[in-house]
């Protein structure tokens, strides 16, 4: 199956030029943000685990496409983070097609990702290798809503400043694949022999994690020229947290992080609204459980809130030291592999 590899490059100018001192005719850096509700209706199967997906019976928190549009006067790009674990490429291609037709923004200037929440309804085909001839009702819906969200972010474009940084948060990421003592049965989740054990629990046969983790949270921040927070896009290599209510639709810690950042920055009830998002990083072997110690019993959503708060607190502490830029050059490269 062909896949896209996208590289986004933001290179700041060597000297940031205050907007008031820009040479005549120089275009300001613009940013616009928006969200679009992509919550499915109840009854669809909640995906992310093995076995038959159970039907969704309750919406604990709404799912969104969180949209960021950046424009340096020459290049315009859109970044979208969707609260969904599975969205077929064909659905994303259709969202880009709609967006290009409505705005002229080229499809290769749009990056769309999913958060990997395990409490969403799938927007991919039942057999990803054999797409159906027609989209399901939810696939049509989510494609429209992604396109709508980016269009609204374009409508909200305004002169802005940009900054970026990183902060380490090692206490919430753990390798879920472990080397085990000789003689331990090693089967993967599909029942096939393996060299390590995935999600081994607090087994007495644990030796050590089979690989490293990436503790870094990277983030891009946007603010208005008056210094009002506009948007924040973060990335963390944590699979998901889980521990939701039974048969609940939820954005998991990704959604709580967005709300908590807005609260910590004092950016609620703005017009246009502040938008934060946490995108999913390189987390294939990383989850939120440290199997080296007993796992404490939590109430539904308790661990989600704990993780989201620690991430948001770490980012907002680093936010205070950001060096803001009035200008930044944008580029986006796409290669099909």
Which residue ranges define each predicted feature?
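Conserved beta-alpha junction segments in alpha/beta enzyme cores
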Residues: 22-113, 117-274, 279-282, 286-292, ...
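Bacterial N-terminal signal peptides
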Residues: 5-16
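N-terminal secretory signal peptides that target proteins for export/translocation
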Residues: 1-2
